[in-house]
Amino acid sequence: MHTTESKNEHLEDENFQTSTTPQSLIDPNNTAQEETKTVLSDTEEIKPQTKKETYISCPLRGVLNVIITNGVILFVIWCMTWSILGSEALPGGNLFGLFIIFYSAIIGGKILQLIRIPLVPPLPPLLGMLLAGFTIRNVPFINEHVHVPNTWSSILRSIALTIILIRAGLGLDPQALRHLKVVCFRLAVGPCLMEASAAAVFSHFIMKFPWQWAFLLGFVLGAVSPAVVVPYMMVLQENGYGVEEGIPTLLMAASSMDDILAITGFNTCLSIVFSSGGILNNAIASIRNVCISLLAGIVLGFFVRYFPSEDQKKLTLKRGFLVLTMCVSAVLGSQRIGLHGSGGLCTLVLSFIAGTKWSQEKMKVQKIITTVWDIFQPLLFGLVGAEVSVSSLESNIVGISVATLSLALCVRILTTYLLMCFAGFSFKEKIFIALAWMPKATVQAVLGPLALETARVSAPHLEPYAKDVMTVAFLAILITAPNGALLMGILGPKMLTRHYDPSKIKLQLSTLEHH
């Protein structure tokens, strides 16, 4: 008996350290002893850590070492560029301006990440990147030495758009779409089309836009930003909020479809605005471009599914490289031959078809594309911020732009709420989905300047309209991205039902199949 009891006590002591058994089920004496040992061991472990944090070690370590290392890397890159290209890397040169915008955007994003307000979720770093570019443009001394050619910025933004579309295509999960069915389709299509139509009507009567430009602006505003929505949905999902109802999955799946629709609508309107033919000719040309895009995307998508084969070395790297280069070539090449917008649809079809065959390998390819996006995101938002000058912002233009944006947002929120009324969600969940479907950032950062660049090249007399579109896109990012992020971070835990063990919950998507 004595031997058995001692063995049991020994097992209980070991299990206490590793198991998650509730404290009330453990012997209080053992608990007290273990807590005393734990406190002593923790104290012994903390002491050397405290000394390391109190005194600056030699050689330097920690944050200070990281700052110095990154600073030296930046300086060496500049020295190497200057030694190869000379004056291009000096103040006033094109590469110098690009470096300043890129690193300023990175610093702006890091600073915004460091800002922590109690009880308030962190703001998205892209807002800091946008403000960094805006600051560079509007500080006289810096602006005199920072110049980036319009051709360069146009190409970089087109590449950024390509990466967004690749991520959207790879992010479409066929299984989730089959489960969510009509609910996902409603959320992706309804609010986007209604906001685009509302923005077109309001901009036509308030901003005096022609109908073609009004709908072009509408599709610029119609897209939601996965860069803002997806990270917050992943955090909520990891903590078990709304998991059983499938709300995070629904929003993440629908965000890609929403962007696809908005970009397709924008490209169609852009081709109509800058074409010289009649309405019938434009419609026929649009249908032709769509057919060419679909055919090219299907052919290239099936090619990438089977080439390279699975027995090759560095398979993921080759697949990521092929998808990226093919899609960038499709987007830039279609612009070169006059098929504007065709490359975007080709990119979506290619990446979606290729991803359906890769299964588990798709996640690795997505990581490669995400790494490339981490490079182009500061460039994108820094260049967009640098396009906006305070001197060109007239108070009346800003006022009517904010009014148009606000009215269109109200229509979007109301439409989202009404469409979710028949999807089996509670009142609080519908409110949360409607507000979470508001943020704008990445698509607006790409499409807003695109109209301005096209006007500068093809139709300079239309440049005032394009500048107004750019202004509205800038204000949309500035207003909706931080507010949407704050609303999701604050209201998510309050309005969504939490399930305390999300790893054991099977998403009850079958409840949504009939809606």
From Swiss-Prot:
Region span, Disordered: 1-32
Ribosomal protein listed as a keyword: no
Biased composition (Polar residues): 16-32
Tissue specificity: Expressed only in the testis.
GO CC, alphabetical: plasma membrane; sperm principal piece
Gene field: SLC9B1
Upper taxonomic lineage: Eukaryota, Metazoa, Chordata, Craniata, Vertebrata
InterPro entries found in the cross-reference section: Cation/H_exchanger_TM, CPA1_transporter, Na+/solute_symporter_sf
Keywords: Antiport, Cell membrane, Cell projection, Cilium, Fertilization, Flagellum, Ion transport, Membrane, Sodium, Sodium transport, Transmembrane, Transmembrane helix, Transport
Record-given protein name: Sodium/hydrogen exchanger 9B1
Pfam family membership, one: Na_H_Exchanger
Disulfide bonds: none
